[in-house]
Regions:
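TRNA-recognition modules of translation machinery and tRNA-sensing kinases, especially anticodon-binding
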Residues: 27, 130-391
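N-terminal alpha-helical targeting/anchoring segments
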Residues: 1-134, 149, 153
């Protein structure tokens, strides 16, 4: 979410950014925002004038009453009453305009970093780095689910009866291995100086709309029926939400946290739930990292967080490559993003295991995450997130 002043003063820059993301259908939003903002400010000015006049007349009424001029006082009371009706209508209109303005502003993409490659889809993402030797075996490699089944470590059939497709039971040594990978990732991040946290696994709607776009929300989130609660799709959601409406002293920054949680995703719009594998599923567990920092430090932290992902997989001797997401593949709130992919010997290709993202001040603006400077200044923080591991 961009600053309204920025949109007002740079409409063509905002439109050009939308074009770079190949989302021309969002271009009308810019003019609509500017028009609604002008109307809202006009209404606000008139409302403030009425409030000032009302306060002035109220003082005059008191003076007239003290002088015994009741008839003149009564006339002014009637004027105040009429102004009160007009003010109530203006306040209603202002709230209506504010809601319409906010709805449109939430749909305008964040300004991407100048270094982001221009492209329409993930097919245009750019390779940044490759680590390790990718080998294609000269023998038939079994599916990972077949290996798990050999050790009696997975039961998809029972899970299908209990919850449907996209779920599974992990058991025995496979379940222990799953937990061990998460524990290894947790300790890896703690050694990097991150504070370990287990967050709430449900969040309110204002946090959901604070951390993601409407498109992402519709494609990912499960809503709890009858409650203003959603199951988290990643612990980033509740971890960033932890700092809603807060001020953090500059001296306390950066805030570096690593969190564990189960994650719940509809996977709406994905290429289906895999028949043989357990890659795109509705429930999984993940270790996450988030950073809240000063704006001038966010790109430095972006590179650090990405390097931690690569280092973790290198420590496990797993070949990985990094792709920079092009403009059209970036979610609306993101300024810059890298996907880290691991090599699958069975499939003979890389697949995504981490997504490192810098969101600038977009989430901070929506959620009111602010920094208090040593000189008393107050400004928005930058937020970043990255997957550690999701076994």
């Amino acid at each position: 979410m961009l600053d309204i002043k920025f949109i007002r003063e740079n409409p063509e820059l905002v439109k050009e950014n939308i074009r770079k993301k190949f989302k021309e259908h969002k271009l009308p939003l810019v003019d609509e925002v500017i028009e609604l903002d002008a109307k809202k400010r006009e209404v606000n000015t008139r409302a403030n004038e009425l409030r000032a006049t009302r306060n002035k007349i109220s003082k005059e009424i008191g003076a007239l009453m003290a002088q015994g001029k009741r008839e003149e006082a009564e006339e002014k009371k009637q004027l105040v009453s009429r102004q009160a009706e007009e003010l109530a209508e203006l306040e209603r209109l202002e709230a209506e305009l504010a809601a319409a303005l906010n709805e449109r502003m939430m749909k305008i993409p964040n300004i991407i970093d100048p270094s982001v490659p221009i492209g329409k889809s993930d097919e245009d993402n750019v390779e940044v780095q490759v680590y390790g030797e990718t080998k294609v075996a000269d023998f038939e490699i079994p599916y990972h689910t077949d290996i798990m089944a050999k050790f009696n470590g997975i039961d998809k059939a029972a899970a299908g009866k209990v919850a449907g497709e996209g779920f599974y039971y992990l058991m025995g040594d496979i379940a222990r291995l799953h937990s061990a990978v998460l524990s290894y990732a947790r300790d890896f991040m703690i050694d990097k100086g991150f504070t370990y946290c287990i967050p709430p696994f449900m969040i309110r709607s204002n946090v959901v709309t604070g951390v993601m776009s409407f498109e992402e929300m519709d494609a990912m989130m499960y809503k709890i029926e009858g409650e203003d609660l959603y199951l988290i799709g990643t612990s980033e959601h509740s971890m960033i939400g932890k700092f809603i409406d807060t001020f953090t002293n500059e001296s306390e920054l950066p805030l570096t946290l690593t969190s564990y949680s189960p994650c719940f995703r509809k996977e709406k719009g994905a290429h289906g739930i895999e028949e043989r594998g357990i890659y795109r599923i509705h429930q999984f567990e993940k270790q996450e990292m988030i950073v809240i920092c000063k704006p001038e430090e966010s790109m430095e932290w972006f590179n650090k967080m990405w390097s931690y992902s690569v280092e973790l997989f290198r420590s496990l001797d797993i070949p990985v490559r990094t792709l920079e997401c092009c403009s059209g593949d970036l979610a609306d709130l993101k300024v810059k993003s890298y996907d880290v992919e691991a090599w699958s010997p069975k499939q003979g290709k890389f697949f995504e295991v981490c997504s490192c993202s810098n969101l600038g001040d977009a989430q901070a603006r929506r959620l009111g995450i602010r920094i208090k400077g040593a000189d008393g200044s107050k400004y928005l923080a930058h937020t970043l997130n990255n997957t550690v591991v999701a076994p």
